[in-house]
């Protein structure tokens, strides 16, 4: 199971969502439902149907609010995967460019950002494994 890194999301769809819920002419809206086991959206008949504008939207994701790195920061691999498989910086540069452009536009739609910090990486790993076991 993977996690979608910047550059793998439908930013245009998310921007349309925020535009519609902020519109004074809001009527109704279909919101995609994502199936993590399939790593894709559910069929449209299973999407959520909003009949009223929500008072609050919780926009959740591991990379929400992530900032791009500087060119200097980008050159230093942060893990063995980057060190071994991205020596030419192709992947890191692509993700970073996404954060500088489309994702910046998306994150500017947010009124606030709440960050939950786990005590350690093993706890995150255990939460993820527990979640993924439920998918299968």
Where are these regions (language model features)?
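Conserved RecA-like P-loop NTPase ATPase core
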Residues: 14, 58, 114
């Amino acid at each position: 199971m993977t996690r979608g890194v910047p550059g793998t999301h439908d930013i245009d769809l998310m921007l349309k969502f925020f535009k519609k819920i902020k519109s004074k002419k809001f009527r109704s809206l279909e919101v995609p439902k994502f199936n993590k086991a399939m790593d894709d959206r559910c069929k449209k008949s299973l999407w959520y149907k909003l009949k009223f504008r929500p008072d609050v939207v919780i926009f959740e994701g591991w990379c929400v609010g992530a900032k791009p790195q500087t060119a200097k920061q980008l050159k230093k691999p942060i893990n063995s995967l980057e060190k071994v498989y991205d020596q030419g910086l192709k992947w890191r540069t692509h993700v970073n460019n996404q954060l500088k452009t489309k994702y910046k536009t998306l994150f500017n739609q947010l009124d606030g950002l709440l960050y939950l910090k786990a005590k350690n990486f093993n706890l995150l790993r255990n939460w993820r494994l527990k979640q993924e076991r439920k998918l299968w």
